[in-house]
Amino acid sequence: MSDNNQATTNASVLTGRVVSDKMDKSITVLIERLVRHPLYGKQLRRSTKIKAHDENNVCQQGDLVRIKETRPISKTKSWTLVDVVEKVEKI
């Protein structure tokens, strides 16, 4: 038997913009991706909104964040905040 001290994870990590931070300990992240049209081959922009857990309420609207998939936290939250890649400037 081999020694397996390292825990392997298959959790996906995504990067997106925070579009809402009005909920307590939660953020809404907009994930954009490019999809090729099956017939014409044109690149189309598709987006998905994902709710993620922000334990310390560190994010604000406009931040670029990295989130990872985790166990279900609530009915709609199965993602958690990994880190803030880029903070938005306050005006």
Swiss-Prot record:
Q: Which InterPro entries match?
A: NA-bd_OB-fold, Ribosomal_uS17, Ribosomal_uS17_bact/chlr, Ribosomal_uS17_CS
- A biological process (GO) annotation for this entry? translation
- Please verify whether the record's keywords include ATP-binding: no
What's a Gene Ontology MF term here?
A: rRNA binding
Please list every transmembrane segment annotated in the UniProt record, as residue ranges: none
Cellular component (GO) terms are:
cytosolic small ribosomal subunit
Which PANTHER family does the UniProt record give? Answer: 40S RIBOSOMAL PROTEIN S11 FAMILY MEMBER, SMALL RIBOSOMAL SUBUNIT PROTEIN US17M
Described by its record, this protein's role is as follows: One of the primary rRNA binding proteins, it binds specifically to the 5'-end of 16S ribosomal RNA.
Name-wise, this protein is Small ribosomal subunit protein uS17
Q: Which organism is it from?
A: Psychrobacter cryohalolentis (strain ATCC BAA-1226 / DSM 17306 / VKM B-2378 / K5)
Name the gene behind this protein: rpsQ
